UniProtKB/Swiss-Prot annotation:
Function: With CysD forms the ATP sulfurylase (ATPS) that catalyzes the adenylation of sulfate producing adenosine 5'-phosphosulfate (APS) and diphosphate, the first enzymatic step in sulfur assimilation pathway. APS synthesis involves the formation of a high-energy phosphoric-sulfuric acid anhydride bond driven by GTP hydrolysis by CysN coupled to ATP hydrolysis by CysD.
Protein known as: Sulfate adenylyltransferase subunit 1
EC number: 2.7.7.4
Gene Ontology BP term (one): sulfate assimilation
Protein source organism: Aliivibrio salmonicida (strain LFI1238) (Vibrio salmonicida (strain LFI1238))
Gene Ontology terms for molecular function: ATP binding; GTP binding; GTPase activity; guanosine tetraphosphate binding; sulfate adenylyltransferase (ATP) activity
Region feature G2, mapped onto this chain: 91-95
Entry binding sites for GTP: 33-40, 112-116, 167-170
Domain tr-type G as annotated: residue spans: 24-240
Gene: cysN
Top-level taxon of origin: Bacteria
Enzyme class: transferase
Region feature (G1): 33-40
Organism classification: Bacteria, Pseudomonadati, Pseudomonadota, Gammaproteobacteria, Vibrionales
């Protein structure tokens, strides 16, 4: 048993400890930044100094440090996170590693993401479920291309809180002037992200020495702010989750007996109360919320992030993939939209190919109609391309084979984010974030004189010259 848990159990008793732990707020954060900036070491230091490591784990780290460690005689705390053999041999992070710990104020889930450019898809996967991004910068090197890339991806995936940790301050003699120089450089860069809602905290630390990670440090006496752990404990994410209109994607129809029929899932955004008027989409049927059921009993209301079962006053047809919203909701139903897409497979994304698309609990079919541009995620400049490669990020036009109720990703990640699934291999090949939605419109049929040659020529133009913005005339044929 680790010493922190043992101490709390002795003070509170088992029941009080479990009750306190259950009602703590949860914060999900990821560590990201350039290669060798010390991301895994920082997580190891957080776990070590907050007394979250079991005795046998610490013994294993001491033993492994002598074999594959990079810190000399001291234990290599990065080995607490880098568990793959290839990671330990190369001294880098490849896969996304998850670790869990708690303090007296909050529970944490940490995603340790890789820094190398070829693992951009892994980083995007880790960021997609996080509330906060801890972005590490090597005090010797300053802001690098990979720092900019990870900041861009974290911002793209809707993370609103950045904690910029200037690491390895021990290697620059804890220089305040060097810290201020890096701070100014990052603040200047962050303005290019064009996100006025971004909350950025910047602090100095040394993960290797433990300075300003969990406790204040005499070596950084000139820094008057809080250490990293305290900053993470005080970030208010509940306000972010409560914003927005009510969205409830139905994941499961719960019918244990003939007398109960409920709809289970997690509240994606907003709040719902007993008695609220709701609409089930896509059917458009209306009803009222009769009960909000949980394992611990009924609730009068539920907020974003809570997993609940809703029962309705009326028996209406609702199935997995349907969406429950309030009757006053302003939601766009469309089959076309623009989205930022992160491509995750060796075979590049090409316009015109159909994929299974999963949005919240709903599965449909769609395709890329055009690629407007790809983003150089190091410089944030854009350039024209006809194919999106592995780890590429670009703005694309997407069309679906049916009308679906959607949000912009920045308004609701669950109903504004989606994944591409290869229809032959069933492999997830890409992820998308909806930026703009197209209103449904009645299109006049094209003249019957359109030939097969013209349809084929139109397809070639859309494939090789997507920046021209040509529409798919085959869809307009009556």
């Amino acid at each position: 048993m680790n010493s922190a848990v043992e101490q709390e159990l002795a003070e509170l008793g088992i029941e009080a400890y479990l009750s306190q732990h259950q009602h703590k707020s949860m914060l999900r954060f990821l560590t990201c930044g350039s290669v060798d900036d010390g991301k895994s070491t920082l997580i190891g230091r957080l776990l070590h100094d907050s007394k979250q490591i079991y005795a046998d784990q610490l013994e294993a780290v001491h033993a492994d440090s002598q074999r594959v460690g990079t810190t000399g005689e001291r234990p290599d705390l990065a080995l607490l996170v880098d568990g793959l053999q290839a990671e330990r041999e190369q001294g880098i992070t490849i896969d996304v590693a998850y670790r869990y710990f708690s303090t007296q104020k909050r529970k944490f889930i940490i995603s340790d993401t890789p820094g190398h450019e070829q693992y951009t898809r892994n980083m995007a996967t880790g960021a997609s479920t996080c509330d906060v991004a801890v972005i590490l910068i090597d005090a010797r090197k300053g802001v690098l291309d990979q720092t900019r890339r990870h900041s861009y991806i974290a911002n793209l995936l809707g993370i609103r809180h950045f904690v910029v940790a200037v690491n390895k301050m021990d290697l620059v003699d804890y220089s305040q002037s060097r810290f201020e120089e890096i701070k100014e450089e990052y603040v200047t860069f962050s303005k290019k992200l064009n996100n006025p809602n971004l909350d950025i905290s910047i602090l100095p630390l040394s993960a290797l020495e433990g300075d300003n990670v969990v406790n204040h440090s005499a070596a950084l006496a000139w820094y008057k702010g809080a250490p990293l752990l305290e900053v993470l404990e005080d970030i208010d994410i509940d306000a972010d989750r409560g914003n927005g209109e009510f969205r409830f994607p139905v994941q499961y129809v719960n019918r244990p007996n003939l007398d109960f029929r409920g709809f289970s899932g997690s509240v994606s955004s907003g709040e719902i109360k007993v008695g609220d008027d709701i609409i089930a989409l896509p059917s458009g049927k209306k009803s009222k919320v009769a009960r909000i059921v949980t394992f611990d009993g009924d609730l009068p209301s539920a907020q974003a992030g809570q997993a609940v079962t809703l029962t309705l006053e009326d028996e209406i047809d609702i199935s997995r993939g349907d969406l429950l919203v309030k009757s006053t909701s302003n939601l766009t139903a469309t089959d076309q939209f623009k989205a930022e897409i992160v491509w995750m497979t060796e075979k590049g994304l090409q316009p015109g190919r159909q994929y299974d698309i999963k949005i919240a609990g709903k599965k449909t079919v769609g395709q890329i109609d055009a690629i407007h541009h790809q983003v150089n995620i190091n410089s944030l400049e854009t350039f024209v391309t006809d194919e999106l490669p592995l780890n590429g990020i670009g703005l694309c036009d997407v069309s679906l084979t049916e009308v679906v109720s959607l949000d912009r990703y920045q308004d609701c990640a669950d109903t504004g984010g989606f994944i591409f699934i290869d229809r032959l291999t069933n492999v997830t090949v890409g992820a998308g974030m909806i930026q703009n939605l197209s209103e449904l419109s009645d299109v006049a049929p094209i003249n019957d004189n359109v030939s097969a040659f013209e349809v084929e020529l139109n397809a070639l133009v859309r494939k090789h010259f997507p920046h021209w913005g040509a529409q798919d005339i085959s869809k307009l044929l009556s």
